Amino acid sequence: IKSSAASDVYKRQVQGLAEFLPISSSGHLAILQNFLRIGNLENQMLFDVLLHLGTLGAVIIAYHTELRGLCREGLMMLHLKKPKRGARQDPPRRRLLLFLIVATLPLIPAAFLNDYLDPLFYDTFFIGFALIATGFLLLAADRFGHGNKTEKAMTLSDALMIGLAQMIAVVPGLSRSGTTISAGML
């Protein structure tokens, strides 16, 4: 089947339903593409990226105030912006920004794995296995996770563990939110 308006609608629905659940929207999109045999799968990657950019846009709109504050705090940390007269630093926001940076650092080496991971997007069996693995990971986190740590009790090593989980979740079918939530609970 060539890519059509109907298949694009299906993909938009999958993306919209799956993105914020711990079920790997990318994995579900790949399964849908493999199942429907939509055109040249390599050409579909651009459409998938656009779907994810649309989701990112929605997140930016929903959290624009917090994101603006994080950006402002980051610029002040780098001394690229002076605080307004009478304004004071925001230690909780600065702490959150530091944790976000630490949790993002493990993704840098993952960027170089693209050539190895790309073929897995075409392997429906592998993606299905990874989706099941995400389910077991969530079950383990629910059963064995401590889950009682507050934001104030979080440490840099916790942020790093969440970042490492995020790095592992670049594997097609593993849910980034599912793995990071599980890492945070365990």
Residue ranges and their predicted role:
Residues 2, 81-84, 149-152:
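Context-gated lysine
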Residues 7, 14, 18, 28-36, ...:
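Membrane-embedded helical hairpins/re-entrant loop segments and their flanking transmembrane helices
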Residues 9, 14, 49, 59, ...:
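Extended aliphatic helical segments
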